[in-house]
Design a protein with these regions (language model features):
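Flexible, acidic/Gly-rich N-terminal and inter-domain linker regions that tether
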Residues: 2-111
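Auxiliary Fe-S-binding modules of radical SAM enzymes
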Residues: 30-54, 284-367
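Conserved Radical SAM active-site core
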Residues: 87, 94-109, 126-223
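Cysteine-centered iron-sulfur cluster-binding motifs in ferredoxin-type domains/subunits
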Residues: 116-125
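Structured alpha-helical segments in the cores of large, soluble enzyme domains
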Residues: 152-159, 210-215, 242-255, 350
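A cross-family glycoside hydrolase active-site/sugar-binding cleft signature
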Residues: 167-169, 200-204, 223-227, 262-264, ...
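Conserved radical SAM core fold
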Residues: 172-175, 206-209, 220-239, 265-270, ...
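Conserved C-terminal portion of the radical SAM core fold
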Residues: 245-308
Length: 367
């Protein structure tokens, strides 16, 4: 059988199995599919061999079919795919050189949002804001020029009068990426002893063991995103279970990492008050004392879009519809957010629940 026929056969079996998992809510089975991630094809810019990481990835995936591309941002074959192919497109791995290094000012938990070693993800959260940026092409892209990117962060920190914090995970999930590239280990090892600056990154994954023994000097803050198990099951396909995320928070606290907890995104399904009340109680009952003492919180309500809905309807026909016209209003071009009074009610409720269980912990913001 030719390679092309094998790939088509694998794709058909994969999509049938994935949709069966969605129909019957078999989250563990979906996690198995994602955790066994091996790209069905590599799409590589032709200059990645000039970089150490590029050569390492080519060696690691030597048996995977390869397609040479001119630009990771413009793969015509991918752009022509249909929305129903979204999940299958996530099985590709794109490798290139990041050409844009623009730091975007930020006023939440960092001073700058920094483009770093990856964008996109192998998981399939139905609300992912990267879909707004990349449409159905929100697959994982790895950038091999990590030395250039980290060097700019270090120089910017060194030349600043104040101590800066850089958000390096706004375009991807670096805990997930680390399982493929070891980039987060490399980053922490090369940043920890610099005289100025801090790094921060969010994650929905629990695979933190590789970074626990590192000498981080308190310069890297890991923020774990949590949601009720029902939401994870129905919406956050291919991410870690709530129990495992909480265990990861405890491990990070014990390893003296600064930690944050994102309750995000808050999704107002029918029984949302019960779900999020139980979530906050679960955190209180299962976080260790060290984590409970030091963690700060962020609360983010879901923003949705026409693009999300179009892709989800075709790619995941058995999944929940997150669009609720009774609760949502338009925001900008093709985006939806919860109506102001609905969001205000949600914030009041969540702040009340947080006061019950975490009265002494800082809530950085609610948006």
């Amino acid at each position: 059988m030719s390679i092309l026929k094998k790939l088509k056969c694998q794709k058909k079996k994969y999509l049938i199995y994935l949709n069966k998992c969605l129909k019957y809510k078999l989250l563990d089975n979906i996690l198995w599919v994602i955790s066994m991630f091996k790209p069905k094809a590599l799409y590589c810019e032709n200059n990645i061999e000039n970089y150490v990481l590029g050569r390492e990835l080519l060696e690691k995936y030597a048996d995977v079919p390869k397609v040479i591309i001119d630009n990771h941002n413009n793969i015509e074959e991918m752009r022509k795919k249909q929305n129903k192919d979204f999940a299958d497109m996530k099985r590709n791995l794109i490798i290139g050189v990041r050409k844009t290094h623009k730091f975007v000012p930020n006023h939440k938990t960092s001073d700058f949002l920094v483009p770093y070693t990856s964008s996109g993800c192998t998981a399939m959260c139905m609300y992912c804001y990267l879909v707004c940026n990349y449409n159905k092409c929100a697959y994982l892209r790895l950038f091999v020029n990590r030395e250039e990117m980290l060097d700019k962060i270090i120089r910017t920190a060194q030349n600043s009068e104040k101590d800066l914090t850089f958000e390096i995970g706004s375009n991807s999930d670096l805990i997930l990426e680390n399982t493929i590239t070891n980039n987060l280990v490399w980053t922490i090892e090369n940043f920890a002893n610099t005289p100025k600056g801090h790094l921060t990154l969010p994650t929905k994954f629990d695979m933190v063991d590789d970074i626990l023994p590192l000498k981080h000097n308190g310069k890297v803050t890991i923020r774990i995103s949590v949601n009720p198990e029902e939401i994870i099951n129905k919406v956050e396909f291919g991410t870690s279970r709530l129990k495992n995320r909480v265990q990861a928070i405890n491990k990070l606290a014990d390893a003296d990492y600064p930690i944050g907890i994102l309750i995000a995104p808050v999704i107002l399904v029918e029984n949302w008050k019960e779900l999020y009340s139980n979530l906050i109680k679960y955190l209180y009952e299962n976080l260790n004392e060290k984590a409970k003492k030091q963690a700060f919180f962020e609360i983010i309500f879901m923003t949705y879009s026409f693009v999300h809905r179009a892709i989800n309807t075709e790619a995941f026909p058995n999944a929940i519809d997150l669009y609720n016209p009774e609760l949502m209003r338009g925001r900008g071009r093709g985006k939806y957010m919860y109506k102001d009074y609905i969001r205000e009610e949600g914030e009041k409720f969540l702040r009340g629940e947080m006061q019950k269980y975490f009265p002494n912990n800082q809530i950085e913001y609610v948006v």
